[in-house]
Curated annotation (Swiss-Prot):
Gene3D superfamilies, alphabetized: helix hairpin bin, Hsp33 domain, HSP33 redox switch-like
GO molecular function: protein folding chaperone; unfolded protein binding
Protein location: Cytoplasm
Disulfide bonds: C225-C227, C258-C261
CDD domains: Hsp33
Pfam families: HSP33
Keywords annotated in UniProt: Chaperone, Cytoplasm, Disulfide bond, Redox-active center, Zinc
Organism: Shewanella sp. (strain MR-4)
Annotated protein name in UniProt: 33 kDa chaperonin
Amino acid sequence: MIQDILHRYLFDNADVRGELVQLQDSYQQVIGSHAYPPVLQILLGELLAATSLLTATLKFSGDISVQLQGNGPVSLAVINGSNQQQLRGIARWDGELADDASLADLFGQGYMVITLTPDEGERYQGVVALDKPTLAACVEDYFNQSEQLPTALWLFADGKQAAGMFLQVLPSQEDHNADFEHLCQLTATIKAEELFTLEAQEVLHRLYHQEDVRLFDPIEVCFKCTCSRERSAAAIKTIDQAEVEAILAEDGKVEMGCEYCNAKYVFDGIDIAAIYANGTASNTQQ
């Protein structure tokens, strides 16, 4: 079974870098907590793979968010992650979605927002329109606008597994566009089934057996939600106390749910009193 792994590699004779990611468990954890329509399962798989590939390009410790928004039946699809390849995501939609719906069908007049938040330093945000036929092409458009380095992506998902590949010219005084185009032609021959079933080394050998490829140590990718009882308590404290106490009087408890992982945090009267007294709550219920 292919594990959730990202591989980075370099073409020593071309000043081009590459990445390959294969996802299963993390993908299932993202889509398993909601009854997503098939087309949305596939979109989230592609978005998860794209975010993992983007995360591997970060040169800092911090977080990344890749968010799709629009005025169509899908109002939001987002994957959040960290430089440690810890990812989570959700989507919101209304009504039935056709299995063959395009990005335009799903989002209408949509756009993609990529937010980079370093642990230290200023946040960066880039926005591009969802006006290309594929998510991969939209991400390429982001790189063309933000980094102005030739970049190409290939994204695949089938509701069970997700995978992706990434190529980018490294900053250099020399022109390596011809090498990049050649490597893109080789990479474009990849099939989803190969990425879903073959080990990364076998995939790279099949694609680039005549190239000088340097493969780096693999990086584990995982689903990780950042919700907690403490964060839920902090969210409750932002609500007017009278409103919370009204809920408590009617239901006997206040329940907070996480959209990402479906965790439930339950607070009783003693907890609520403690939250408004000093911002803490007991850890006895979840």
